[in-house]
């Protein structure tokens, strides 16, 4: 415990239990923080680009995840260090805001930290480095605006959207089907998009998966798919022109909410009670038929006797449907969710062209398709695959593609990928450094060098000579003054990203630079780390 004394000689505590805490100050704290950030970036660096490696992660309960999605890798890593946790948050915020570029943003932050360490070794103050980085990031973002290209698309001509989504999917495990998956993602987004307001609600796109079949069997359903079947095996498997009652109330006789009990001591009394319950449920079924319902979808269950009665009355039903699915069914069919049975009216019924039950494989697993709905602004992407891991990774890939398509609808500007945008920004930032007379000039040049880390990592992961490849592409960009030359990762034979159709969204690339700069500035400003000792 550290004690100090005031002017009257009275002791007071500055730092409680100091002997049980470890403390790093000044340059040591900054070096330790930078080392932690670089360690996280090093893990993800090999996952960048179309030839990036996958990581296998084992959870505490033995579940295995195989992925190269930056956000997922960091999410599932058991990180203790607080600076490493900041890098995890950085990746998560990129995923939340943009949906893509989660690996690139961490690699960029790691490179900025590495360059900052060199500047600290030269004796430059961390605040001056942070200010230099801020200036450089502004130059880079403005340059991206200048080299960005706008493109037009509509519901009938969406090829540019597909090409951009294919760039996103090319680094995933599903890249052999990237064309078909990109088309599915774009069609799904356009189906739910409000093109006038240029807004997309991704909650209206449900992504379902079922083990079996192959990746090529993945399909887009203009409607809702639920992992349920009809409550009775003898109910019809297909209903044309369905009128759907969507219930969140129990579809059974009500339970009395009192502490009273009924004593039944004779067979006649039991028979009377059973008949009363049956009559009550009979009336409920009749009410559904009277309002015109041809299918009941219920959030709760009902017993076998009720199920049998529904089958006899020719009223198909589905039970134990989740709340999120009910909401999507209501949106798709134009129906209203009925919380109290007495409120069921014909106006609250949803309408669907066809509701069908489909079996999969030899295990007779069934799912319910609700298609040709009154309101098509709710769709389902149904993924097939050889195993659960493949389906989970495909879901993550589809999520990235959906986010990219949404971002392009919001902002139609694109930049060229393959490291072309980073190289162009690096050259622009390097040229701008001469305009700043102060010490910040060194930090701005360091920022330009850090931008080169992304194309370097792309070249390295593709099995190319990173330094040779980068210098060749840089000189090509300077010589021809064209910012579209990048790293030829797929060995096509041309560095021109326009010919390779490698696009990225402008806002995704800008967000990467801004978020990485913010986190690095935050880390550089920490000069004192007090943590509990391990002993």
UniProtKB/Swiss-Prot annotation:
It holds the Pfam family Cpn60_TCP1. InterPro entries: Chap_CCT_epsi, Chaperone_TCP-1, Chaperonin_TCP-1_CS, Cpn60/GroEL/TCP-1, GroEL-like_apical_dom_sf, GROEL-like_equatorial_sf, TCP-1-like_intermed_sf, TCP-1_chaperonin. It is found in: Cytoplasm. Keywords: ATP-binding, Chaperone, Cytoplasm, Nucleotide-binding. GO terms for molecular function: ATP binding; ATP hydrolysis activity; ATP-dependent protein folding chaperone; unfolded protein binding. PROSITE patterns: TCP1_1, TCP1_2, TCP1_3. Coiled coil: none annotated. SUPFAM superfamilies: GroEL apical domain-like, GroEL equatorial domain-like, GroEL-intermediate domain like. One of its GO terms (cellular component) is chaperonin-containing T-complex. Transmembrane segments: none annotated. NCBIfam families: chap_CCT_epsi (TIGR02343), thermosome_alpha (NF041082), thermosome_beta (NF041083). Belongs to the TCP-1 chaperonin family. Heterooligomeric complex of about 850 to 900 kDa that forms two stacked rings, 12 to 16 nm in diameter. Molecular chaperone; assists the folding of proteins upon ATP hydrolysis. Known to play a role, in vitro, in the folding of actin and tubulin. This is T-complex protein 1 subunit epsilon.
């Amino acid at each position: 415990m550290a004690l100090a004394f005031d002017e009257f000689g009275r002791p007071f505590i500055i730092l409680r239990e100091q002997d049980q805490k470890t403390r790093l100050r000044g340059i040591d704290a900054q070096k330790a923080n930078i080392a932690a950030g670089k360690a996280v970036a090093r893990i993800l660096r090999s996952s960048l680009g179309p030839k990036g490696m996958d990581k296998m992660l084992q959870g505490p309960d033995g579940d295995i995840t195989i992925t190269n999605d930056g956000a997922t890798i960091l999410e599932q890593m058991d990180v203790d260090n607080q600076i490493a946790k900041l890098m995890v948050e950085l990746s998560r915020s990129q995923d939340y805001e943009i949906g893509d570029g989660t690996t690139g943003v961490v690699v960029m932050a790691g490179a900025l930290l590495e360059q900052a360490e060199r500047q600290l070794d030269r004796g430059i103050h961390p605040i001056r480095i942070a200010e230099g980085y801020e200036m450089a990031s502004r130059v880079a973002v403005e340059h991206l605006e200048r080299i960005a290209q706008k493109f037009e698309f509509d519901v009938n001509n969406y090829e540019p959207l597909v090409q951009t989504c294919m760039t996103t999917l090319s680094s995933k495990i599903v890249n052999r089907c990237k064309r078909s998956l990109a088309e599915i993602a774009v069609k799904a987004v356009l189906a739910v998009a409000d093109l006038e307001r240029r807004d997309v609600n991704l909650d209206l796109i449900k992504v379902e998966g079922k083990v079996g079949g192959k990746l090529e069997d993945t399909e887009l359903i203009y409607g809702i798919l639920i992992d349920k079947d009809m409550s009775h095996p003898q109910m019809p498997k297909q209903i044309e022109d369905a009128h759907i009652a969507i219930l969140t109330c129990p579809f059974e006789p009500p339970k009395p909410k009192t502490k009273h009990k009924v004593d039944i001591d004779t067979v006649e009394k039991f028979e009377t009670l059973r008949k009363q319950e049956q009559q009550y449920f009979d009336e409920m079924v009749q009410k559904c038929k009277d309002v015109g319902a041809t299918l009941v979808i219920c959030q709760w269950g009902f017993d076998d006797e009720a199920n049998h009665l529904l089958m006899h009355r020719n009223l198909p039903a589905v039970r134990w449907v989740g709340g999120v699915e009910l909401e999507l069914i209501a949106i798709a069919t134009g129906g209203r969710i009925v919380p109290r049975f007495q409120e069921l009216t014909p106006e609250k019924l949803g309408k669907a062209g066809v509701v069908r039950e489909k079996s999969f494989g030899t295990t007779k697993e069934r799912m319910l398709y609700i298609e040709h709905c009154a309101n098509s602004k709710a769709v389902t992407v149904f993924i097939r695959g050889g195993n659960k891991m493949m389906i989970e990774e495909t879901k993550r890939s589809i999520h990235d593609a959906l986010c990219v398509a949404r971002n392009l609808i919001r902002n139609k500007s694109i930049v060229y990928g393959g490291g072309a945008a980073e190289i162009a920004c690096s050259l622009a930032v390097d040229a701008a450094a001469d305009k700043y007379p102060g010490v910040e000039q060194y930090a701005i040049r360091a920022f330009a060098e850090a931008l080169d880390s992304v194309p370097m990592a792309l070249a390295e992961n593709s099995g190319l000579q990173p330094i040779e490849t980068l210098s060749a592409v840089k000189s090509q960009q300077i010589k021809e003054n064209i910012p579209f030359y990048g790293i030829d990762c797929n060995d096509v034979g041309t560095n021109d990203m326009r010919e390779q159709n490698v696009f990225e969204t402008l806002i995704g690339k800008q967000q990467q630079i801004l978020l990485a700069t913010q986190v690095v500035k935050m880390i550089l400003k920490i000069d004192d780390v007090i943590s509990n000792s391990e002993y």
